[in-house]
Structures are given as structure tokens and as C-alpha cells.
């Protein structure tokens, strides 16, 4: 069985584009849950460009599934997570100029800082995952932090148009997933996955959960949120046979 985490950031982006109260990402989360989402992912960025604390507070109190809060290792957001104690937090790198998260955490390069954040979140009864590139060096460092989960960055696989390069990137993801599993880590994956490329990743047996946002919200513009979520979940389950 493979789980689907639906990222609702882009619903909030649409709301913030006009400074209105709608569309409400909280409502989108409820629709996604009813359509088969196993978790709801939201990124509370330091600059609060889309998801805001109000969203996280309501989601943490009302979701029937799980809230996976994406966040940088930044003091203000860490305090929010400690206070609200969502089911899961995924630590990600963050730069103000980026449109979306552009790569995995350099866990090995900032091991003590990330380890401290993991310990603080664990003390708040939050399960921590680390968003990392499919690199054995980073996976070994992730294990040293005490985080029980890693999320493999699938962006290079998803964004390349070259067939040979895509196959190579998929091989790296598969190898990394196997290695992380051998270390005792739960393996999730995400970034750039859509309705055309998701099945090859969903078929990797070591991967437990995929987090997908932009493709689902974009598809929802034409077919509605419930259908968009159900379509993605169906593709994932088909890939697992």
C-alpha cells in the first residue's frame, strides 16, 4: 500500500494573489481527505507567502488524517510546530528567492543544527522527516539526526525531458529508497510528480508515501479537487498492482 499526501500550498497561493479569503486551503484539505488523501501537506514558509499560521492552526485541530507541516529549520516556525504539534513535520531547505523548494537539505553539512531541531520536534510528539536528495551520504547523515523518515527529492527525475537521464534519475531514487529502507528509515518521496510520471516512482516498493501538490491543484482547476485527488490516488495504487 502506498499513501498520498496532498500539498495544498497552491490553493493558498491563489488566495494570496488577490489578498482575499478564498479559495480557502482548509476547505481544499477537507475535500482532498474525502477524496482519498491519506495526509495533508502544507509549507509554512518563513515569509508566509502562501500558507499562514491560521491555516496550520485550523488544520492541526480538524484534520481526520494527518497534517504534514513542511518547514525550514528556522526558530519562528519551529516554535509554531512545537506549539501546535502536528502529526508530522518535514524539514526542507528554504530560500526567499525560490519559487518552490529547489533541492534537498544538506544534512551532512549542518548536522548539529538539524539534529537539535529533530530533538525539539520529537519532544513535542512530532514525527520528523528530512527532505533530501537521493544520495547515500545524505541518507547516512539523516539517520544520525534521529529522524525516523526521509522524503526523497524527485525533482530531477520529474523535470528532465531526456529519456535516458530520466531513467538514470529513477535508478538513483530506487537505489536510495532501498538504502534508506536498509537503514531503518521510512521512505517517502515527492517534488515535481504529476499524472504522467508518478507511476514509475509509486512502483518502487520501498516508498511508503508520495507528497504531491502542484499537479493536483492544476488538474483541479479543470476537474475539481475531489476528482484530481482521486485520479492521482488511482494511478498510484495501479502502479503497486
From Swiss-Prot:
InterPro entries registered for this protein in UniProt: Aldolase_TIM, PyrdxlP_synth_PdxJ, Pyridoxine-5'_phos_synth
Chain positions recorded as 3-amino-2-oxopropyl phosphate binding sites: 7, 18, 192, 213-214
Enzyme class: transferase
Pathway annotation from the record: Cofactor biosynthesis; pyridoxine 5'-phosphate biosynthesis; pyridoxine 5'-phosphate from D-erythrose 4-phosphate: step 5/5
Listed GO biological process terms: pyridoxine biosynthetic process
GO molecular function, a single term: pyridoxine 5'-phosphate synthase activity
Alphabetically ordered keywords of this record: Cytoplasm, Pyridoxine biosynthesis, Transferase
GO CC term, one of those recorded: cytosol
NCBIfam families xref list: pdxJ, PRK05265.1-1, PRK05265.1-3, PRK05265.1-5
Protein name listed in UniProt: Pyridoxine 5'-phosphate synthase
Species, as recorded: Acidithiobacillus ferrooxidans (strain ATCC 23270 / DSM 14882 / CIP 104768 / NCIMB 8455)
Classification lineage: Bacteria, Pseudomonadati, Pseudomonadota, Acidithiobacillia, Acidithiobacillales
Gene designation per UniProt: pdxJ
Amino acid at each position: 500500500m502506498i499513501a498520498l499526501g496532498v500539498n495544498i500550498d497552491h490553493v493558498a497561493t491563489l488566495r494570496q494573489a488577490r489578498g482575499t479569503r478564498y479559495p480557502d486551503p482548509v476547505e481544499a484539505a477537507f475535500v482532498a481527505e474525502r477524496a482519498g488523501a491519506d495526509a495533508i501537506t502544507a509549507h509554512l514558509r518563513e515569509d508566509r507567502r502562501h500558507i499562514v499560521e491560521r491555516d496550520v492552526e485550523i488544520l492541526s485541530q480538524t484534520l481526520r488524517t494527518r497534517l504534514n507541516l513542511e518547514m525550514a529549520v528556522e526558530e519562528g516556525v519551529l516554535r509554531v510546530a512545537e506549539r501546535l504539534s502536528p502529526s508530522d513535520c518535514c524539514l526542507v531547505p528554504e530560500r526567499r528567492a525560490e519559487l518552490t523548494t529547489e533541492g534537498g537539505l544538506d544534512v551532512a553539512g549542518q548536522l548539529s543544527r538539524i539534529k537539535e531541531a529533530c530533538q525539539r520536534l520529537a519532544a513535542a510528539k512530532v514525527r520528523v522527516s528530512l527532505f533530501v536528495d537521493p544520495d547515500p551520504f545524505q541518507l547516512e547523515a539523516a539517520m544520525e539526526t534521529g529522524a525516523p523518515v526521509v522524503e526523497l527529492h524527485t525533482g530531477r527525475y520529474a523535470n528532465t525531458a531526456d529519456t535516458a537521464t530520466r531513467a538514470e534519475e529513477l535508478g538513483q531514487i530506487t537505489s536510495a529508497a532501498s538504502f534508506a529502507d536498509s537503514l531503518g528509515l521510512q521512505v517517502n518521496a515527492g517534488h515535481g510528480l504529476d499524472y504522467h510520471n508518478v507511476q514509475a516512482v509509486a512502483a518502487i516498493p520501498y516508498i511508503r508515501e508520495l507528497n504531491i501538490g502542484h499537479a493536483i491543484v492544476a488538474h483541479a482547476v479543470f476537474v475539481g479537487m475531489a476528482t484530481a485527488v482521486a485520479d492521482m490516488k488511482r494511478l498510484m495504487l495501479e502502479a503497486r498492482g
